[in-house]
Regions:
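N-terminal and secondary-structure boundary signal
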Residues: 1-103
């Protein structure tokens, strides 16, 4: 079994530049990932925790949209998913097709 690459990006911004923002750091990470296994129109699950009831420990839509855009740029057809219960009330937390860029 080969070792997986682990990427680390500090949440410390330290600079007042756009390239130091968390969104820019995620974009840099996505540029280093290998999306070559995605073929045109492949369905690609973006598996995440969408929250439950009053929980708020979820990934902001701002970041999800960047991941979705990277999958689309590779030719894939992304969709956000979680367990069935969480999917039903995902819109209440802001996870919609319009905000995420995919179903």
């Amino acid at each position: 079994m080969t070792k997986s690459k682990v990427y680390f990006g500090s949440i410390q911004q330290g600079q007042a530049h756009g390239f130091a923002s968390l969104g820019a750091k995620l974009d840099t990470l996505l540029e280093h990932l290998d999306f070559s296994s995605i073929e045109k129109n492949d369905k690609v699950a973006v598996k995440m925790h969408l929250g439950f009831h009053d929980g708020y420990q979820t990934v902001p839509v701002f970041f999800v949209r960047r991941i979705v855009n990277a999958v689309k740029a590779a030719g894939g057809w992304p969709f956000v998913t979680d367990n069935p219960t969480a999917v039903y009330n995902a819109a209440e937390r802001g996870y919609t097709q319009e905000t995420c860029g995919c179903p």
